[in-house]
Amino acid sequence: MNPNQKIITIGSISLGLVVFNVLLHVVSIIVTVLVLGRGGNNGICNETVVREYNETVRIEKITQWHNTSVVEYVPYWNEGTFMNNSEAICDVKGFAPFSKDNGIRIGSRGHVFVIREPFVSCSPTECRTFFLTQGSLLNDRHSNGTVKDRSPFRTLMSVEVGQSPNVYQARFEAVAWSATACHDGKKWMTIGVTGPDSKAVAVVHYGGVPTDVVNSWAGDILRTQESSCTCIQGNCYWVMTDGPANRQAQYRIYKANQGKIVGQTDVSFNGGHIEECSCYPNDGKVECVCRDNWTGTNRPVLVISPDLSYRVGYLCAGLPSDTPRGEDAQFTGSCTSPMGNQGYGVKGFGFRQGTDVWMGRTISRTSRSGFEILRVKNGWTQTSKEQVRKQVVVDNLNWSGYSGSFTLPVELSGKDCLVPCFWVEMIRGKPEEKTIWTSSSSIVMCGVDYEVADWSWHDGAILPFDIDKM
């Protein structure tokens, strides 16, 4: 075959392949059109149908592709609307894990803040973990001495729930060594307490900017909840303490609307002590279970009405839930008086379920280790000892710490009741371990309609860190 014949042959083959390729594309287009025609889509490949609902909480987005429909639920919230939060608490049978940040494990090699007092609060579209930093990172020399509660370096910051308190995702909220935060449906409100012990100031932030202040009125370490405040129909409520930690102090309830204080009430509680209240909305009121750092091993209860009237007493249950505490068998409960005659204490929580109560406590009676939650029949209204459910969250071989409450709003959960949730802080480092620092991580649990098995969701960091060996 001469060169000209070779060129003609190669050209003919190439032309044939091109024609064949064009025919394949034509067939593919015809088949696609026929398939779409059978699907009844009138030839539209992608169609988005938006359906409006009476509740402005979701958009139903239907994407049709060939003969398959994919339904996505897109969260939507009108930011010009206050949350209701006047619903009742859901009745639950157990608590399932919601999130765990593993901050200390990650912080051995990551840029994670040294923190204490983490807590969770939710808006209509998200939950966030708030925490008080020490202005330093784990495994860094500035972490030395961070066992101290109050310093000018402490700040309130937040991340999306489940994230570690890392420098890349954290959002600054306030300068604070004591704090609370909550969302009214429109914006976040945070309260950060800072300054000298005798003249501390609480700065109210709304939407990220300062809007009001509370100055210390007793001159003795003004402090607040270290957990979520509570917003109901646009008004937000929180509790503050000023005065001694080991004898009679002074207590106040505050009410704010869009970051401006619109009311306050002194709580008369002679012989009782209130600190670090864990509050939540229930049936249009604010229910708080607090810490008695003076004498009681039972917990103070404060129920706040929208007009700032209140009822104050103690959790009636015949089982103690503070730490340190005595034996369960030797404890007799009281709805009105401190019982147990044990000083000191730890922040804790409880949830009313009708006349029952879910109450959290450390497993150890003498130290902040282990954590369990008990349901006590009629424990909200009577000195009952009858446990109808118990769930272990952290075993007694591992450290725990503070614990507190919050709820999932109906706008977020899609339920017609408020889902009760709690968090448990797991403190590591000083004073119990040989480190130069003190920090914590947390596990978060939310109520479900099923019983949940015992397990230990403990911190799990291996100590000491490199900085502790220098």
UniProtKB/Swiss-Prot annotation:
Cellular localization per UniProt: Virion membrane; Host apical cell membrane
Topological relation to the membrane, as annotated: Single-pass type II membrane protein
Residues annotated as signal peptide: none
UniProt cofactor(s): Ca(2+)
Protein EC: 3.2.1.18
A GO term from the CC aspect: host cell plasma membrane
InterPro entries from the UniProt entry: Glyco_hydro_34, Sialidase_sf
Protein activity control: Inhibited by the neuraminidase inhibitors zanamivir (Relenza) and oseltamivir (Tamiflu). These drugs interfere with the release of progeny virus from infected cells and are effective against all influenza strains. Resistance to neuraminidase inhibitors is quite rare.
Region (Hypervariable stalk region) location: 32-86
Residues bound to substrate: R116, R150, E275, E276, R291, R368
Pfam families: Neur
Biological process, per Gene Ontology: carbohydrate metabolic process; viral budding from plasma membrane
Recorded catalytic activity of this chain's protein: Hydrolysis of alpha-(2->3)-, alpha-(2->6)-, alpha-(2->8)- glycosidic linkages of terminal sialic acid residues in oligosaccharides, glycoproteins, glycolipids, colominic acid and synthetic substrates
HAMAP family linked: INFV_NRAM (MF_04071)
Reported function: Catalyzes the removal of terminal sialic acid residues from viral and cellular glycoconjugates. Cleaves off the terminal sialic acids on the glycosylated HA during virus budding to facilitate virus release. Additionally helps virus spread through the circulation by further removing sialic acids from the cell surface. These cleavages prevent self-aggregation and ensure the efficient spread of the progeny virus from cell to cell. Otherwise, infection would be limited to one round of replication.
Family per record: Belongs to the glycosyl hydrolase 34 family.
UniProt subunit comment: Homotetramer.
Protein name: Neuraminidase
Naturally occurring in which organism (per UniProt): Influenza A virus (strain A/Duck/Burjatia/652/1988 H3N8)
Gene name tied to this protein: NA
